Amino acid sequence: MKSKIIATAAILAALAFLHPHPALSQPATDGGKKTGFWQPQAQVDNTRNITLRLLNETGLNLEYGQSGASLSSLPVGTSKNIIVRISNRTGDIANIPINSTGGTATLKYDYNVDSQTNLVTVRITRSDPRTSQDRSVYIDEKGRVYSF
């Protein structure tokens, strides 16, 4: 009997030291955004055709893919436009992987949206290898643009 009382007291004492901590999936307690891959980088109008403009500012040759197509090249200092048409949309709207040829460099994507023309400019640069790298531009069914 005495051991049950001691065990119960020890458990209650241990629980007193626990503090609630917000999980990663919870909204920020200060009402603002917390940076991370789960936050959209941009927003587009998903009721109109979307133009993705890829700008290669890495100093390296890149390759990118589109659903149902083979890899295409994006040479140093060039840009390519990818049209995402309404008829192409199923659950998610677009997933465009972009990598350096051979996957040898860490990349970073910066976004700029022209809401009048529904143009998303993706500026691709090199990033510090110690940071997480961007590998794909993803647009979901609500028009939110993410880097993964």
Annotate each language-model stretch with its function.
Residues 2-55, 99-148:
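Intrinsically disordered, low-complexity segments enriched in small/polar residues
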Residues 47-49, 57-59, 69, 77-79, ...:
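Extracytoplasmic
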Residues 60-61, 145:
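Short beta-strands and strand-coil junctions in structured, solvent-facing domains, enriched
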